[in-house]
Amino acid sequence: MVAFHPLTVIDIRRETEEAVSILFSVPPALRDAYRFAPGQYLTLRTRIEGEELRRSYSICNELRVAVKTVPEGKFSHFANAHLAVGDTLDVMTPDGRFTAPIEPEKAKRYLMIAAGSGITPILSLAKTYLHAEPKSQVTLIYGNKSAASILFLEDLQGLKDTYPTRFSLIHILSRQPREVPLFNGRIDRE
């Protein structure tokens, strides 16, 4: 059953100048309720200046979400500037159907495309497929403004190091020139 529970923040990691990732501790009695499938999301609830705010964020890995500061974003500003380890937020149990079956016996080729903070569900899916489907390959095309704005850069590099023949990563940057023109610009239909 989908419900809110108070969870404690146990880690806040600065991913870029504009984004943090937040890791929650789940009490043993709630572990089954917070098991998630790659691609699902959490809804966070808190009160800021007397106003109840709810925001949904895709689960990256573990029970971690990424929050990127957006203009006029009350919750995103709060999470990036004021949220601290030890704080408690109301967190709804995982939800969402942006998932796919895991088939360890099959050899699949996944093409994943993400831009900016849209990497969060994709990262979770890529990690799972690479780990659980030993014959499968993942190619990720990931668009960002600049190298400094790439969320989860260390995690992505870790996947390249762990699965060098099965994980291909292509960075497309819109505001930082690259040597190969193909890797400049935005990801779009063209």
Model-derived segments and spans:
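Ferredoxin-reductase
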Residues: 2-88, 92, 144-146, 157, ...
